[in-house]
């Protein structure tokens, strides 16, 4: 009888502990009372991958399955556009950028397009078949000029509308899962397996390799507003580069919430708040330098993984899957 009572008590303790743990996993963070985001659904199975504007109101959204949408109201509504591309190829439009009316689109497989009239007409530029890797990131630099990076870390620059390209690195970084460009022209990338990251500065001939900070594989990496780096690792771990110029100095792991979903991107808004987005509608915000976090109520209701955040001076978007995205409206929603 004593053994039975003891076993029953142990079982009860296990059940109580399990329930309490499962409860605190998803309710550990408070939900913000308001949100600056407006949810949009574009009624498509395509995944939005990038967005760019020619001015405060006119811009384009690109994505998988050849998706290209145009807005003339700052992103409140989006209209279908099409590109003159072979029907048999299912292009993935990964990156778009504008400098005024001059714009560029990079996609896969082997796609690069250029416009000089705000996107009303696009010209396909055919790349050398010996190009290392596939186009991954395009940056409009100014009149007739752009910089292109591939998914193996090759970096090229053109000053004649894409007629010719000059290699800026002699040795690519290797296959990458994430690659970002800083405002100063530097790059940072995460290896395809997430076991190291690499940095490149203008004028360098090769990438500099850095080992990951912990045993957790890296998911993504990017630039803070001050030029220092941030990184997201598996296990929903965030770290901030805390010593300017020292790429080996990082904060301890910041784990805002353990809900079984990782983070895929981070961004800072104009007020200095930090946003982190990830799986299953995970959208968190910190307004005190990552010390405390809140769940965004609009993001939390979305049936989508948030894969990318795009912030510029006039716009901000959180890109999801299957036509889901969030648009910054600023006012409380």
From Swiss-Prot:
Lipid-modified residues, N-palmitoyl cysteine kind: 24
Main location: membrane
InterPro entries found in the cross-reference section: PSII_CF48-like_dom, WD40/YVTN_repeat-like_dom_sf, Ycf48/Hcf136
GO cellular component, one term: thylakoid lumen
Keyword presence, Thylakoid: yes
Biological process terms in GO annotation: photosynthesis
Keyword DNA-binding belongs to the record: no
Lipidation (S-diacylglycerol cysteine): 24
Membrane topology: Lipid-anchor
Signal sequence interval, chain numbering: 1-23
SUPFAM superfamilies on file: Oligoxyloglucan reducing end-specific cellobiohydrolase
Subcellular localization: Cellular thylakoid membrane
Pfam family membership, one: PSII_BNR
Keywords from the named record: Lipoprotein, Membrane, Palmitate, Photosynthesis, Photosystem II, Signal, Thylakoid
Domain text: A 7-bladed beta-propeller torus, about 55 by 55 Angstroms, with a depth of about 25 Angstroms and a central pore.
Similarity comment: Belongs to the Ycf48 family.
Biological function: A factor required for optimal assembly of photosystem II (PSII), acting in the early stages of PSII assembly. Also plays a role in replacement of photodamaged D1 (psbA). Assists YidC in synthesis of chlorophyll-binding proteins.
Subunit annotation: Part of early PSII assembly complexes which includes D1 (psbA) and PsbI; not found in mature PSII. Binds to the lumenal side of PSII complexes. Interacts with YidC.
Name the record gives this protein: Photosystem II assembly lipoprotein Ycf48
């Amino acid at each position: 009888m004593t053994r039975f009572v003891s076993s029953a008590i142990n079982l009860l303790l296990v059940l109580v502990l399990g329930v309490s743990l499962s409860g605190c996993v998803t309710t550990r963070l408070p939900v913000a009372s308001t949100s600056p985001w407006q949810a949009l659904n574009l009624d498509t199975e395509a995944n939005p991958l990038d967005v760019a504007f020619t001015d405060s109101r006119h811009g384009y959204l690109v994505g998988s399955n050849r998706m290209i949408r145009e807005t003339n109201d700052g992103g409140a509504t989006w209209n279908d556009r099409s590109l003159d591309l072979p029907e048999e190829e299912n292009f993935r439009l990964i990156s778009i950028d504008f400098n005024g009316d001059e714009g560029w689109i990079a996609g896969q497989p082997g796609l690069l397009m250029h416009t000089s009239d705000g996107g009303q007409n696009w010209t396909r530029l055919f790349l050398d078949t010996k190009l290392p890797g596939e186009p991954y990131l395009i940056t409009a630099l100014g009149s007739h000029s752009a910089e292109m990076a591939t998914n193996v870390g090759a970096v090229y620059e053109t000053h004649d509308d894409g007629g010719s390209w000059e290699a800026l690195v002699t040795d690519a970084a290797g296959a990458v899962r994430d690659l970002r460009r800083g405002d100063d022209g530097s790059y940072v990338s995460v290896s395809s397996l997430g076991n190291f990251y690499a940095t490149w500065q203008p004028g360098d001939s090769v990438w500099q390799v850095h080992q990951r900070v912990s045993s957790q594989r890296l998911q993504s990496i990017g630039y803070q507003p001050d030029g220092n780096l941030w990184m997201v690792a598996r296990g929903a771990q965030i770290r901030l580069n805390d010593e300017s110029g020292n790429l080996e100095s990082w904060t301890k792991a910041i784990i805002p919430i353990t809900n079984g979903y990782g983070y895929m991107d981070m961004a800072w808004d104009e007020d200095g708040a930090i946003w982190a987005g990830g799986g299953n509608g995970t959208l968190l915000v910190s307004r005190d330098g990552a010390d405390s976090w809140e769940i965004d109520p609009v993001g939390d209701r979305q049936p989508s993984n948030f894969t990318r955040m795009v912030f510029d001076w006039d716009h901000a978007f959180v890109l999801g899957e299957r036509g889901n995205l969030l648009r910054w409206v600023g006012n409380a929603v």
